[in-house]
């Protein structure tokens, strides 16, 4: 069901909670969606520039102030011996990539130390399609051992990839019904601010068609 009505974000979340009042599935996800117009610029150069905004955004990850969902699994690619990193789910080098390739393990993130990132180039065809190729923007290429632990802790708290689909849409889960309204609202507002700060004002005004809030099984509300 889709309700094409304009609401402020607070009202939209309250309406979704009311809609799901008698539903026992409290794991239903609250989702925020962004819809961007395909550029109508006649300049090929401008088309490339504007498409680049979303391309760059799609390389980033975002951490919500209020954690929800299952803690992500993290794999570390390294040939070094490291101690005191029991919070890492999988550690290895070529053997680790083999397990990822044959789906023996399915980590949410693959991290690597900066001085070893070159060793992963030959595995780009394996890691790329799975969305596991480490990048600095996603925080999965780590400068040194000193910040490795803090990087793992940040990812474990729930760092979500921003994915832009072929229709120029972004859909991200921002919480579930086990959370209180204030927590959901804080997550939504932090995501809105994050994306707003990474897109030029001129692009948002001309290309951001709508923002909506919905849930796994339920109505959608366009927010203003």
Curated annotation (Swiss-Prot):
Please state where this protein is localized: Mitochondrion
Instruction: Spell out the Pfam families in the cross-references.
Output: Ribosomal_L1 (PF00687)
* Single GO biological process annotation from the record: translation
Keywords from the UniProt entry: Mitochondrion, Ribonucleoprotein, Ribosomal protein
Q: Which NCBIfam families match?
A: rplA_mito
> What family name appears in the similarity comment?
Belongs to the universal ribosomal protein uL1 family.
What's the name of the protein? Large ribosomal subunit protein uL1m
Query: What species is given as this protein's source?
Result: Reclinomonas americana
